Amino acid sequence: MARIFENLNHENKLKVKQALTQLIMPNVDSAEYRMAFSELGSELGILITEKYPDLGNVLLVCASEDADWLAKGLIDSLHHNIGLAVLWSNRITICQDPKIEVSEINKSYVDMEGDTCDTMIVVKSIISTSCVVKSQLNYLVKRVNPQKIIIAAPVMFVSAKESLMNEFPASVSSKFKFLTFAIDDVRDDKGVVLPGVGGMVYPKLGLGNQVEKNSYMPQIVRDRVFASSRA
């Protein structure tokens, strides 16, 4: 099956396809890679606003590597004062055949008004398996009790939605709304989705390997901490 596109229209089709193509270009530099994710984040934000105009109190959830580009692009396009949860995690393979991975959250930054939210938006560069998003949801859902959970990514693997739905009881999964622009169904022998987002995200963003990216403090977090200290 060739890549399937979703949620494209006259307004966003060219920009979204150009950004997705930029991600998979050979030897793309980190500045261009970051810019492509910023553009895709912006377009996801516009799409969310169009589909769900009544978001209420919002908490945006992302991994640390997605915060400054994909997540910030989404936040800036929402024109909405929203909370932010940034999670740092390690992805660990616990079995090779079949391949089973878990994601362990080792630190977090959560900035939100009040104890609960109406809408939780989980945004990720690519949803290949349920691993990372499952950990993020387990970490936060009971804490903030969202009424709606929007799971958004520029690219998803064909079975990602079903995998995530199966990881949670109906009381949680019934709240899920999935949004993407591209669905792929091919993996290489290492499990990397093709064409996906061009491979491993961390080094392409200029953040190094998994250990190095976990030492990166996103600028969006720095800005929020500084703003709260000045308030």
Model region roles, listed by residue range:
Residues 1-231:
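PRPP-associated nucleotide enzymes
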